[in-house]
Amino acid sequence: LELYKEVKNTFPNLDDFKQQFTQAYSRYLVLFPNDKIPTIVTSVPGLDTQWPSVFLYENDLNIYLDMYLGADNKIYKQSGIPLYISERMDKKFLLVDCFKKAIVYKQLPEKTLVTLLDRVIYEGKKLYFTQTMLPNEPLENIIGYNEEKFQWAEQNYGKVWAYIVENNLLYSKEENVIRQFAEEAPFTNPFGNNSPGRMGQYIGWKIVSAYMQNNSEVTLEEMMKNTDSQNILNNSKFKPTK
């Protein structure tokens, strides 16, 4: 009952959100005209953080509103959800998540992600796609960092990349290596507590952005469908300074 109350307080109505979504989706339809706008379906399943907070099923865009109550919400604290997860459980991330966690899969081909590079490029595509659909959204919201973490990533991604390359981790198939750089974590090992997690995703976004900048003849759709991670890396000419 308390959860429903919190949802009602946070989302007295969804008019603004629906308007923003429709606007962003019309941008999507210009690039992918064979698609149709999904129906928004909201529910409150009861804080299941193991399940995506937004997902597509047929033509329904399902949104779990109890996953967007704000990082400081007492229910999240009582439920023991760690801060690095709850930081993104805020309604300012809802529109981003609709594209990053759901709509993007309409354009991402199924691919077995074998190496860290595969995963990095895959995650980078999701972020680049979302940024293209939401050009007015602050970049830190698209990446899912607060301002401090975003600044750290911006200043240090060259160091993280150098570490990955110098330690021969780029083509690693080890699950723990892929997890270390590409999945949810309070920080990125071995860069200390000030670093954000998911630095591999951030680097992937940088590589894909460089690829699109250096290959202006490539369309968004072509890039999304290109499953050759090495090809994207090579043609990105990505060479950050340490």
Locations of the language-model features?
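Acidic/His-rich structured neighborhood in mature extracellular/periplasmic domains
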Residues: 1-150
